[in-house]
Amino acid sequence: MPGLRVPERRFSRVLGVGSYRPRREVSNKEVCTWIDSTEEWIETRTGIRSRRIAEPDETIQVMGVAASRRALEHAGVDPAEIDLVVVSTMTNFVHTPPLSVAIAHELGADNAGGFDLSAACAGFCHALSIAADAVESGGSRHVLVVATERMTDVIDLADRSLSFLFGDGAGAAVVGPSDVPGIGPVVRGIDGTGLGSLHMSSSWDQYVEDPSVGRPALVMDGKRVFRWAVADVVPAAREALEVAGLTVGDLVAFVPHQANLRIIDVLVDRLGVPEHVVVSRDAEDTGNTSSASVALALDRLVRSGAVPGGGPALMIGFGAGLSYAGQALLLPDPPSTPA
């Protein structure tokens, strides 16, 4: 019986990154006009000073396309060269057709396949691992990864416990072939005992049947999520380094999920991240954008020129599930004309 013929395996890396940040920047002072709080309390507890909130015309598709165009330009890849589009989002209310198809079509990537995934704050790292596998297996040459979120659509702005944390935005990356390993193995995991720690207040079908339950909105046990992040995410980050053959001292950058700066600082401390490593603190003026947060932070880091192209970085996303995913990667060179 004949066997299957498969392409020769190769290496992959991130060729380019891009992002889109909504026009409207909302300060803590403005947030305090809709919740009973103070600017000082919010910044002290979270490190967040402002966040971006999308206007009605800044849909998840619009933001995703804009981020993708910047990533394609940075990578020097034409949309027609994209073989696969993977979109991560938890805030797409149109479940069919797939958002990936709409984004690919608007970009002119009509030769591509595409699908969406939903893994909350870990979504971008999951999507990047799929892209790397697709390139390394020979199934695709160029893969576009997009993470796009309107978190303000799924929160109650009057909820004093979490409305100040979240923002909107999109990030993207183009993955392609490489002469050397450029994306490390993904480390992923779940803790189903934490299902109730970060969840929706009700389902949409419950809301349709009985509007008195209220529009579905995020509910979070912040203390439980914080304890889990320290207990589970830190070992996962160490494992992601180990399987890539790196130590924390080898890194030039650390790009964690931008939950808030307090959690980031604890992760940095527990991991023993040296002072020479640049740590992304994008949440300070972007807020928590769920799956888009790592992508947004990565784009800002690369375009800042603060780290060398080709240097190793560690990314890890974590949140609802509870779940996490992370990997090491070699950073792309900054764009020749930073924007």
Swiss-Prot record:
It catalyses: malonyl-[ACP] + propanoyl-CoA + H(+) = 3-oxopentanoyl-[ACP] + CO2 + CoA; 2-methylpropanoyl-CoA + malonyl-[ACP] + H(+) = 4-methyl-3-oxopentanoyl-[ACP] + CO2 + CoA; malonyl-[ACP] + acetyl-CoA + H(+) = 3-oxobutanoyl-[ACP] + CO2 + CoA; butanoyl-CoA + malonyl-[ACP] + H(+) = 3-oxohexanoyl-[ACP] + CO2 + CoA. Its EC number is 2.3.1.180, 2.3.1.300. It is an enzyme of class 2 (transferase). Pathway: Lipid metabolism; fatty acid biosynthesis. The gene is fabH. NCBIfam families: fabH (TIGR00747), PRK09352.1 (NF006829). GO terms for cellular component: cytoplasm. Homodimer. One of its GO terms (molecular function) is 3-oxoacyl-[acyl-carrier-protein] synthase activity. The keyword Plastid does not apply. Keywords: Acyltransferase, Cytoplasm, Fatty acid biosynthesis, Fatty acid metabolism, Lipid biosynthesis, Lipid metabolism, Multifunctional enzyme, Transferase. The keyword S-adenosyl-L-methionine does not apply. It holds the Pfam family ACP_syn_III. Gene3D superfamilies: 3.40.47.10. InterPro entries: ACP_syn_III_C, ACP_syn_III_N, FabH, Thiolase-like. This is Beta-ketoacyl-[acyl-carrier-protein] synthase III. Belongs to the thiolase-like superfamily. FabH family. It comes from Streptomyces lividans. GO terms for biological process: fatty acid biosynthetic process; secondary metabolite biosynthetic process. The lineage of its organism: Bacteria, Bacillati, Actinomycetota, Actinomycetes, Kitasatosporales. The last Arg residue of the ACP-binding site is essential for the weak association between ACP/AcpP and FabH. The active site is at C121, H257, N288. HAMAP family: FabH. Catalyzes the condensation reaction of fatty acid synthesis by the addition to an acyl acceptor of two carbons from malonyl-ACP. Catalyzes the first condensation reaction which initiates fatty acid synthesis and may therefore play a role in governing the total rate of fatty acid production. Possesses both acetoacetyl-ACP synthase and acetyl transacylase activities. Propionyl-CoA and isobutyryl-CoA were the two most preferred substrates, although acetyl-CoA and butyryl-CoA could also be accepted and elongated. Involved in the biosynthesis of R1128 polyketide. It is found in: Cytoplasm. Residues 258-262 are annotated as: ACP-binding.
